[in-house]
Amino acid sequence: MLDIKLFRNDPEFLKEKVAKRGMDSKVVDEVLELDEQRRQLISQAEEMKAERNKVSGEIAQKKRNKEDADDAIAAMRNLGDEIKVLDDTLNQVDVDLNDKLSRIPNIIHDDVPEGATDEDNIEVKRWGTPRTFEFEDKAHWDLVEELEMVDFERAAKVSGARFVFLTGDGAQLERALMNYMITKHTTQHGYTEMMVPQLVNADSMYGTGQLPKFEEDLFKVEKEGLYTIPTAEVPLTNYYRNEIIAPDVLPAKFTAQSACYRSEAGSAGRDTRGLIRLHQFDKVEMVRIEKPEDSWQALEDMTHHAEAILEELGLPYRRVILCTGDIGFGSSKTYDLEVWLPSYNDYKEISSCSNITDFQARRSNIRFKRDKNAKPELAHTLNGSGLAVGRTFAAIVENYQNEDGSVTIPEVLVPFMGGKTVIRPTK
């Protein structure tokens, strides 16, 4: 959520930023109108409450003097009724203002390129050379079924479309990837491992920006009023919600493996085969809570941490800066890492690393003190995939396939696979 002071102090700047996001800039005027209405109502209510207190004192004085106080009592009742109407109106204006503010995206960084779609993203780095096969290579969705690593058909029977059973070597490879990624982030990159709740309340979803704008993308447990998490970013970021963080805690660096649940609303017909777009998938997440002056370097560091995984796995990738039309709602700047997938003859997103600045911290009331006597300040929050496990799985199967239908295990994963170096067809 943006600071209301920005709207009051520099509305033209905000209109420019909002317009670059593809929103109608009149939303800034609508916020200012509600804000002015709110301030007028507060002023009127305070004046009436002061008058009520004055009349109350007069009533007490009249009673002490044994004078008739009926007119004053009637006046106080009328004031009370008027104050209630004002308070009710003020409460509704507060709701309307907060709802309006909660649907306005973060201010984009000056580095973010203007554009409408992912085709306008700017490539800033490329690592590795896509493999040239000397045989007819196969897509991962064919390879994993031939190797009996997955079962889509039975998953559809049990749960529906866009679910999968990982079986045998497939389950082992998925687990090996998660263990490897978590170990790398905790032992070499300085993150604290967390095991997170996978059901969270509406306040948590609001804090990280999924609610109210993106509710259709979520799965909800109606009876309990809880949501399945779309990413471990949600519980990790909310860990310090409504808290003032002690001076010696920052930077806070968390990593967690979790299942992620997404309805994929609006993605019908996209990536319908294989492991690229599922309703449930595993992901290793990185979350950082930083002092404002440190957050931009933290974004670079976190992106390098995700890249280190891809490089150790030997997977060609590129880094792009997301444009104004593709960047996420809460992000000020986002790098996407895209891994090479031969079946697409293209790069596909495998990680997003974003600086959310104080956007989530304001919604979640995450503050810190520079010393014990200092005034609390809003922290900056960042998040990044390190990595999406299913997409890494698919990339390994495609890039490490052999002519006989087997898949070589990347060297760095062999210890996590119990020493296994190749996954071979069982038939």
From Swiss-Prot:
What keywords are annotated for this sequence in UniProt? Aminoacyl-tRNA synthetase, ATP-binding, Cytoplasm, Ligase, Nucleotide-binding, Protein biosynthesis
Localization: Cytoplasm
Give me the residues that bind L-serine, please.
T231, A232, E233, E285, S385
Q: Key word ATP-binding present in the record?
A: yes
One BP term from GO: seryl-tRNA aminoacylation
Reported EC number(s) for this entry are 6.1.1.11
Cysteines joined through disulfide linkages: none
The UniProt entry, under InterPro entries, shows:
aa-tRNA-synt_IIb, aa-tRNA-synth_II, aa-tRNA-synth_II/BPL/LPL, Ser-tRNA-ligase_type_1, Ser-tRNA-synth_1_N, SerRS_1_N_sf, SerRS_core, tRNA-bd_arm
- CDD domains reported for this sequence: SerRS_core (cd00770)
Q: Which PROSITE patterns match?
A: AA_TRNA_LIGASE_II (PS50862)
Binding of ATP, residues: R262, S263, E264, E349, I350, S351, S352
Q: Which family does it belong to?
A: Belongs to the class-II aminoacyl-tRNA synthetase family. Type-1 seryl-tRNA synthetase subfamily.
The UniProt comment on domains reads:
Consists of two distinct domains, a catalytic core and a N-terminal extension that is involved in tRNA binding.
Protein name (Swiss-Prot/TrEMBL) = Serine--tRNA ligase
Organism whose genome encodes this protein: Staphylococcus saprophyticus subsp. saprophyticus (strain ATCC 15305 / DSM 20229 / NCIMB 8711 / NCTC 7292 / S-41)
Q: Which gene encodes it?
A: serS
